[in-house]
C-alpha cells in the first residue's frame, strides 16, 4: 500500500437481530470517538448506523458498495455480534482488499473465537479502542507488521491467530477529542422529537459486580475527565445542535463527589441551562449532592437496585445494603428528582422467593420507572464462567442475549418460571392505580411514556383474562 496519508474508513453500528424488540436508537458513542480520533489524524471517515437508519442486511450491502473503504470497522455487544459478523462477511465480499475490524465488548472477550469463526475478519480491537485504532492506521500506511500493536488479536501473515498483550488504559481522558457527532445521521436518532445526546465523563469502575462486562472492558482504575472538559462538551453540543437535554452514560456518575460538585458549579458559571440525567450507585449519593445536582439541571437519576434480597446482592458482589437503597430513593424523591430503578432478575441463586422480595421491594421504593433485566451471562464476566462451569446454559444463540429472555436456568429457577416472573414484575409495577395517577400528573416525556406503558400492560392483562 505504501504511504497513503488519508485512509478511507467506514465505521458501522450493526442492526439488531430480527427477533429482538428493537430499542429506539441511541447515539453510538464508541464509533463517534473513533471517528473523531481518525479525522484528527487526517483520515476520511464515514459512519453507517444501521439501527438509526433502519438498514437491513440487503440495504447495508448496497450502502457499503457505494463507499470506498480501506478499513471497515464494526462494533458489537454480545447481542449484536452475529449481526456484526454478517456485515463483516458482506463488507469483505464487496471490498476484498479492505481490512476488517471488530471492536466493542463482545469482541474483547471473544477475540480468538471470532477470528476462528469468521475468516472474513482480520483484526479484533480489544478494550478501549482509540489509541489502538490510530496505531493500526499508522501501521497500515507504512506496511509494517502488527506484531507490536498492543490491544489487538489478529490473523498474521501465516494465517495464524496472534494475541498481543493488552494496551494500558488512557490515563488522561481529556486528551481525547469530543465525539464526531457530525458523522452521525442525527435526524434519524430522534426520540419523541429530539435527539438525546449521551456523554461519558469517566471510564472504569471501582466496583466489580459479577454480572457486568463494562468494568472488565474499561478496568478497575476510575479515570475521569476534568469538570471543564465535560462542560465544554455540553456547551459545544448545546450551541451546535440546539440541544437542551443530555444523559450521562457513566457506570457510576458520582464516584468522585467533588468532581460532580465542580461540574455543577461550572454549569452555573456558564449559565448553561441544560436538563440532564445520570446513573449511579445508591451508596454514592446524599441529600446535599442530589440538591446540588438538581439545582444544576439534573432531572432524573438511575439508581441500581439490582435485587431486594441481601443474599442475592451478596452473590452479585454488589456491596450495597437494602437500607442504603431505601435511603437513596427516599432522598431523591424528597429533593424532587425522578428515579429509575435498574433491577436484575434470575442471577444464579435466585429463587421464586427472592424474586418476589425484589418485586415487592421495588414497589416499596416507588421509583418513577423501572427496568427489570434478566441476568444474562456475557463472556468475560464471572457470572458467565459460573453458568458454563455448572452446565446451566440453555441458549447459545447470542441473538437471544437481549436481557429480556432468560438464557440459562439453575436448580432453583427454571427458564419458564423466570420469564413469567419478569412479565409479572412489570405488570404489577405499572398497573398500580397510584402509579398511573402520579405519572398522569407529571406529564412531560417521562410521564407520557410511563402512562403509555401502563396502558399497554393493562390491555395485555385484559386480553389474557378475556382469552
Indicate residue ranges for each PLM-predicted region.
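Flexible glycine/acidic-rich beta-alpha junction loops that bind and position SAM and/or redox cofactors
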Residues: 18-20, 111, 157, 207, ...
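Proline-aspartate-enriched helix->loop->beta-strand connector
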Residues: 68-69, 243, 367
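Catalytic cores of alpha/beta
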Residues: 111-117, 289, 349-363
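N-terminal [4Fe-4S]-dependent radical SAM core
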Residues: 7-10, 15-18, 146-149, 155-201
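Radical SAM [4Fe-4S] cluster-binding motif and immediate context
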Residues: 26, 174, 178-347, 351, ...
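Non-cysteine beta-strand/loop elements that form the S-adenosyl-L-methionine
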Residues: 129, 290-308, 368-377, 397
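Radical SAM enzyme core and accessory elements
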Residues: 2-6, 11, 44, 61, ...
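Glycine-rich beta-alpha loop elements in corrinoid/cobalamin-binding modules
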Residues: 8, 24, 37-172, 376, ...
Amino acid at each position: 500500500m505504501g504511504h497513503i496519508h488519508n485512509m478511507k474508513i467506514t465505521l458501522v453500528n450493526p442492526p439488531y437481530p430480527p427477533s429482538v424488540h428493537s430499542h429506539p436508537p441511541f447515539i453510538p458513542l464508541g464509533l463517534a470517538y473513533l471517528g473523531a480520533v481518525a479525522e484528527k489524524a487526517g483520515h476520511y471517515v464515514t459512519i453507517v448506523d444501521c439501527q438509526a437508519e433502519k438498514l437491513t442486511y440487503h440495504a447495508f450491502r448496497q450502502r457499503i458498495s457505494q463507499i470506498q473503504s480501506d478499513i471497515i470497522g464494526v462494533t458489537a455487544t454480545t447481542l449484536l455480534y452475529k449481526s456484526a459478523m454478517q456485515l463483516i462477511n458482506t463488507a469483505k465480499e464487496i471490498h476484498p482488499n479492505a481490512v476488517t475490524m471488530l471492536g466493542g465488548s463482545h469482541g474483547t472477550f471473544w477475540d480468538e473465537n471470532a477470528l476462528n469463526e469468521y475468516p472474513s475478519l482480520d483484526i479484533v480491537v480489544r478494550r478501549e479502542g482509540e489509541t489502538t485504532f490510530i496505531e493500526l492506521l499508522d501501521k497500515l500506511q507504512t506496511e509494517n507488521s502488527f506484531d507490536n500493536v498492543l490491544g489487538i488479536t489478529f490473523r498474521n501473515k501465516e494465517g495464524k491467530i496472534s494475541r498481543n498483550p493488552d494496551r494500558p488504559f488512557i490515563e488522561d481522558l481529556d486528551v481525547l477529542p469530543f465525539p464526531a457527532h457530525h458523522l452521525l445521521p442525527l435526524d434519524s436518532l430522534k426520540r419523541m422529537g429530539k435527539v438525546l445526546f449521551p456523554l461519558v465523563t469517566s471510564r472504569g469502575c471501582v466496583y466489580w459486580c459479577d454480572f457486568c462486562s463494562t468494568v472488565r472492558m474499561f478496568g478497575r482504575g476510575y479515570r475521569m475527565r476534568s469538570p471543564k472538559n465535560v462542560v465544554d462538551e455540553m456547551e459545544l453540543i448545546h450551541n451546535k445542535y440546539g440541544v437542551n437535554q443530555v444523559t450521562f452514560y457513566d457506570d457510576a456518575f458520582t464516584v468522585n463527589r467533588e468532581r460532580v460538585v465542580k461540574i455543577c458549579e461550572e454549569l452555573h458559571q456558564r449559565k448553561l441551562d441544560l436538563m440532564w440525567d445520570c446513573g449511579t450507585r445508591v451508596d454514592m449519593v446524599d441529600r446535599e449532592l442530589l440538591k446540588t445536582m438538581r439545582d444544576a439541571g439534573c432531572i432524573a437519576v438511575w439508581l441500581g437496585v439490582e435485587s431486594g434480597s441481601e443474599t442475592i446482592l451478596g452473590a452479585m458482589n454488589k456491596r450495597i445494603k437494602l437500607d442504603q437503597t431505601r435511603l437513596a430513593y427516599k432522598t431523591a424523591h424528597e429533593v424532587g428528582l425522578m428515579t429509575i430503578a435498574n433491577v436484575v432478575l434470575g442471577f444464579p441463586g435466585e429463587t421464586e422467593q427472592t424474586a418476589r422480595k425484589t418485586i415487592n421491594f421495588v414497589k416499596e421504593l416507588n421509583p418513577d420507572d423501572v427496568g427489570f433485566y434478566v441476568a444474562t451471562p456475557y463472556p468475560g464476566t464471572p457470572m458467565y464462567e459460573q453458568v458454563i462451569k455448572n452446565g446451566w446454559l440453555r441458549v447459545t444463540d447470542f441473538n437471544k442475549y437481549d436481557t429480556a429472555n432468560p438464557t440459562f436456568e439453575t436448580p432453583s429457577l427454571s427458564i419458564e418460571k423466570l420469564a413469567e416472573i419478569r412479565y409479572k414484575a412489570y405488570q404489577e409495577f405499572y398497573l398500580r392505580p397510584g402509579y398511573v395517577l402520579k405519572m398522569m400528573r407529571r406529564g412531560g416525556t417521562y410521564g407520557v411514556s410511563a402512562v403509555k406503558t401502563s396502558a399497554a400492560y393493562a390491555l395485555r392483562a385484559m386480553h389474557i383474562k378475556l382469552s
